[in-house]
Amino acid sequence: MNSTMLRVTNRIIERSRDTRAAYLARINQAKTDTVHRAQLACGNLAHGFAACQADDKASLKSMLRNNIAIITSYNDMLSAHQPYEHYPEIIRKALHSANAVGQVAGGVPAMCDGMERSLLIREVIAMSPAIGLSHNMFDGALYLGVCDKIVPGLTMAALSFGHLPSVFIPSGPMASGLPNKEKVRIRQLYAEGKVDRMALLESEAASYHAPGTCTFYGTANTNQMVVEFMGMQLPGSSFVHPDAPLREALTAAAARQVTRMTGNGNEWMPLGKMFDEKVVVNGIVALLATGGSTNHTMHLVAMARAAGIIINWDDFSDLSDVVPLLA
């Protein structure tokens, strides 16, 4: 390992010793030796699966099969989140094939352009999944989100339930549209009064034109890359288009993977344990190596702190001295 990277990593470990230990103690206290729903009163448990189909009810009554929470940020106004409309059904089918059950446990506010008070909204997003996950119905969670402050907020939420294994599922990038040079040309003509508003709108709509993340390497696409580097989503899953057959296959594979990571599986790995100081350094390296969004110099600090890990901008600065820009 590069000596600077090792020094920064060890510095973060030492700085975070007390807060990390307190965090790990908290999530260890929340861990159970059986499925979480076994602790519920019968009335509460019956309420939790009342709307399920018969075979899912039987599975949940048995106390033997995993129940996986689906936390979604689907809406129709945000192109990167519109593909999530049909993900729950894909996930449920994949979970059934793995002898598990999937339930949509709740949603989060998901907007991007024009969202005011960005960091406050990130905190609201971080708190929203707690409503669904706090019912103690679930043995793992899948998080559907990709844009700007939504992924950082979801990560903070997942870490607040760090005793559960969690996997993030991206939606993938929008296909390329109108080339940037042409878009810039039309914007310039509009500024000069040589084309009207409709021409400008047609240009913008031809550029930002389909489901998926924006066609530039902004915060949303940085989210996908950083989360992949941190081991929170499947390798190679970031940049597959929403309508590609591979995207559906990756979504199903992510659902099956989280079942293997539960206490009933053979690869038990709660997110809070996996998300350690080395994972955080991997995230910073991913950001620096890919020339990602500088918004993550704020978001990664908050994400790490949610796991009891303390990083600061000196860590970013020192790592930036030795991490080459690859793309």
List each language-model region with its residue ranges:
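Metallocofactor- and cofactor-centric catalytic cores in central/energy metabolism, strongly enriched
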Residues: 1-327
